[in-house]
Amino acid sequence: MFCYQQNFFNPTKEVDRNVFWALVGAPYTKELIDGIRIRKEKAATIMAANVEEEQILASAALGEADQLKKKLPAFIFQATFDVTKSKKGYEGAWRKQAATRLTGLVVMDIDHVDNPVDVTRGWLTDDCPCLGDRCRELGILLVYVTPSGHGLKVVFKARTEWGNLIDNQHRMAALLGVEVDEACKDASRMSFICRKEDILFINEQELFSYENKEFAEKYNDVYRGGHSQPTLFDTVRR
């Protein structure tokens, strides 16, 4: 089981099937994400026109998009958190690396792509010409388009033999032929939620119940100690 944070000022809460679908299906979620994409498209159009006097409008649109994004709830797939006290003394499952309990899930960001759906078509093989079959073959449990409309989140099962979270990302990225966002190495990293219609694949049977105790036992203390760098020097990288 993983968790989510309603906003930066709230402790995390665990996610089950009902909570997940309520979050991604909420009209509020769709309204925010639609607003983000409208503003990003506006900024892209202005920048493409390359009119110097209008670039300030592009910056303003991007700033508005960023503010809307910060209003979205966010999933934390990689971990849940022990109850601790906030800086103001409030108890809760605050999103702290030092309070990490790894779930055995890994989340990988694929950023700056023109057409996310086309990217997933590149993952298919002759043996697995269907996205669902390919995801099941690789242990992928969830794929969705990010709020920007130009990225993908890929949630998959960690393999202890592949190393820690970022090691696992590099190995999966090599299999899919994509680049890894190195910023996504921490166990406490948030993933802003998506609209229901942006989910390209989901394995509901495992996503909400999966855990890898072996992985957690090996790496919990490592992440609690603030260490999230790659551990395997032979990790496959493009």
Which residue ranges define each predicted feature?
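DNA replication initiation modules
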Residues: 5-9, 13, 94-117, 158-238
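Short Gly/Ser/Thr- and Asp/Glu-enriched loop/turn motifs at secondary-structure junctions
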Residues: 145-152, 185-190
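Signature for HUH/AEP ssDNA processing cores
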Residues: 1-150, 157-163, 231-237
